[in-house]
């Protein structure tokens, strides 16, 4: 009996082992790796704000309206064609945020080649309020002078783009080789030596998006409240959080 029980138990053990062997889970074929998905690059907030916000449009229109209102006082009794307003081009009259957006999407930096290609597209849109302001200047008997640090080779494309956004400039002064400082060009406008046939002008206002767009100004004045006394009177600045001479300032 004992031997029978042992044999029976041994038989059960064998059956259990055999049965268990049939339940072994074999490893499944490894799944192929999921294809990588290119995640769209986020547009930096400063570019998004410039391109999409209501606040930006309110600020540019507000600035140009203030400048137009001041003209009535500054030019009262002044002979027509004897005075002028000097404006910067980029981010003052011409909106190049599409160029900045493309650079962000491509994760690429500014280059002269990419910038030249963009300018030659001649598709920059107008800064809100700019065209209406320049038309107001002409209606009051003034002249519009654009002083820009675009290269001389880009001047024709710049003039064409200005006309496309309904800005009729009486004079466009691009950057002569080696002269990034705008002050000499400002002086030539005043002296009547800026271009043949362009008479000396009493410059009554300057408008720009960079502190360097204003006579004798630089980032060094930022801690001197007295240096800003002409802003809102004859100098009018537009917001540009995308780029500018401010980028060269080191945090304290």
Question: Could you describe each region identified by the protein language model?
Answer:
Residues 2-12:
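Bacterial N-terminal signal peptides that target proteins for export
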Residues 11-21:
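Bacterial N-terminal signal peptides
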Residues 23-87, 249-252:
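Non-catalytic pre-domain segments flanking phosphatase-related domains
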Residues 54, 142, 151, 155-252:
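C-terminal cap/substrate-recognition subdomain and adjoining C-terminal extension
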Residues 65, 69, 128, 132-135, ...:
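Solvent-exposed, polar/charged alpha-helical surfaces in well-ordered, non-transmembrane soluble domains
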Residues 75-82, 93-125, 139:
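Active-site neighborhood of HAD-like aspartate-dependent phosphohydrolases
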Residues 83-93, 152-154:
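Acidic helix-start/capping segments at beta-turn-to-alpha-helix junctions
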Residues 116-145, 152-153:
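Short, acidic loop-to-helix structural element flanking the phosphoryl-transfer center
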């Amino acid at each position: 009996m004992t031997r029978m029980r042992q044999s029976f138990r041994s038989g059960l053990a064998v059956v259990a082992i055999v049965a268990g062997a049939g339940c072994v889970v074999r490893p499944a074929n490894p799944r192929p790796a999921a294809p990588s998905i290119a995640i769209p690059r986020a547009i930096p907030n400063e570019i998004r704000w410039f391109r999409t916000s209501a606040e930006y449009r309110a600020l540019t229109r507000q600035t140009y309206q203030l400048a137009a209102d001041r003209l009535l006082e500054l030019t009262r009794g002044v002979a027509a064609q004897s005075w002028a307003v000097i404006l910067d081009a980029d981010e003052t009259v011409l909106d190049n945020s599409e160029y900045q957006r493309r650079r962000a999407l491509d994760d690429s930096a500014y280059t002269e080649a990419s910038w030249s290609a963009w300018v030659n597209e001649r598709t920059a849109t107008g800064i809100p309020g700019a065209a209406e302001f320049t038309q107001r200047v002409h209606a009051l008997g003034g002249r519009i002078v654009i002083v820009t640090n675009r290269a001389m080779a880009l001047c024709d494309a710049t003039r064409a783009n200005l006309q496309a956004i309904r800005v009729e400039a009486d004079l466009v002064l691009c950057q002569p080789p080696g002269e990034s400082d705008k002050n000499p060009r400002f002086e030539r406008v005043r002296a009547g030596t800026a271009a043949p046939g362009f008479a000396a002008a009493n410059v009554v206002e300057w408008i720009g998006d960079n502190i360097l767009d204003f006579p004798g100004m630089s980032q060094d004045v930022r801690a001197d409240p007295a240096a800003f006394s002409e802003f809102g009177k004859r100098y009018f600045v537009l917001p540009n959080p995308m780029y500018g001479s401010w980028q060269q300032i080191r945090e304290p």
